[in-house]
Amino acid sequence: MRSKLVLYILSAFSVFSCKSEEQKKEEATPLHTRGEITLQYDDSFVNIAEALSQRYVKVYPNAKINLKVSKEDQALEDLLNHKVDMIIMSRELTEKERKYWDAKTKLPWQPSYFAADAVCFVVNKNSEKQHVSLEEIKEMLKSGAKKLIFDGANTSNLNAVLQKLNLDLKDVKYSRLEGNENIIESLEKFSNHIGVVSYNTISRPYGERATELRENIKILPIKVGDSLFLPNKENLKTQKYPLTKLLYFLTDEGTFGVANGLIRYSCTDIGQKIVSREGLQPYNLYPRTINIIHK
């Protein structure tokens, strides 16, 4: 009986020691390499969000990033209410939103910019229309003809256009379809309409889906004075394209966990190369140094 008691005590001590060692090992593992978070973002940012998060979890397989698509304004609301861990935004917060951020998070508002995207105006490939101007866009929104197709209110694309043209949501009229890809596909049916989509939806140079979408549309350059500007990397870099959008992360994570790890990964060299491969303009430019050795 006594020997059984001793054996039980030794077994319990062994299990306790193993658990302690496992706990110590886990505690020694950096927080940004393990754990689970939810990243929420507008439909406009699907491709870049997937590319960055998928690469991150390949580097850190013990990290899990759940992806959630919503309207841009809904993503901000969910972050402020602690329903998600981080979001992608393309517009600046209003003064009221900044005050709410300060009250809800107790953290400084610190946007982490990582890419330049754009709002694109696209038509069916057979359309005779060659370009569009900001003045024309404003007139179409106010006319009631609903020739512009957006992906709904409170979305990144509509937010950017309204902000640029200094218009209020209640004063504009437009057609609506859910999803940037759906808008592009609908232009074959609605040949007299103009689709308003994110550049990121079609920017992947060699992406099979992006290529398929590009083949059926024509991107309208925006006319400014006598110049025409397309949403290409150079015009996004200089922001000469009038509807350039700067994408950034926001998180209320108070430690250097998976959320802040993803931010650092996305904003430094490797992440910026991924941004470039997605066809977007990297926000942070890393100069390449070439050492020439004279013999």
Tell what function each PLM region has:
Residues 40, 66, 85-88:
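Short, conserved beta-strand segments within well-ordered enzyme catalytic domains
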Residues 41-42, 71-75, 82, 261:
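Glycine-centered small-residue hotspots that permit tight backbone geometry or close packing
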